[in-house]
């Protein structure tokens, strides 16, 4: 019989779980999770962005997701970044070819952006984690 717990647990296990939580009676080794500690490497340079649109759906980033962005990290080829192009924030995969800078969506209906010297593209930071709402 599956029972819903009326209140949140006092603390959350901090271990890897493959398929089950084990016995609810055995709470040894339980500590509180600090998502700041787990997810954020550079607290002064981290911020959250709410994703709008489906341009990065094939990368698992959907409309309404929260993206954790780290501005202290160097953006490398192939990483998902938040960038500003023509005064618009974009979530795209960064591409570098020779001296050219590209922003690619995973949705084939969204055109790639290749920055020339005339374009104003500013990479704000690297997306390190994506937070999804799965219920509610």
Question: What is the predicted role of each segment?
Answer:
Residues 64-65, 79:
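Structural motif
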């Amino acid at each position: 019989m599956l029972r819903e717990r009326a209140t949140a647990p006092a603390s959350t296990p901090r271990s890897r779980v493959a398929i089950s939580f084990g016995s609810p009676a055995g709470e040894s080794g339980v500590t509180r999770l600090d998502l700041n500690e787990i997810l954020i490497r550079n607290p002064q340079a981290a911020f959250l962005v709410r994703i709008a649109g489906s341009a990065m759906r094939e990368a698992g980033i959907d409309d309404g997701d929260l993206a954790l962005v780290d501005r202290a990290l160097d953006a490398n080829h192939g990483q998902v970044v938040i960038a500003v192009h023509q005064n618009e924030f974009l979530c795209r995969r960064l591409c570098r070819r020779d001296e050219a800078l590209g922003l690619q969506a995973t949705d084939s209906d969204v055109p790639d952006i290749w920055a020339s010297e005339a374009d104003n593209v500013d990479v704000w930071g690297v997306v390190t984690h994506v937070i999804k709402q799965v219920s509610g």
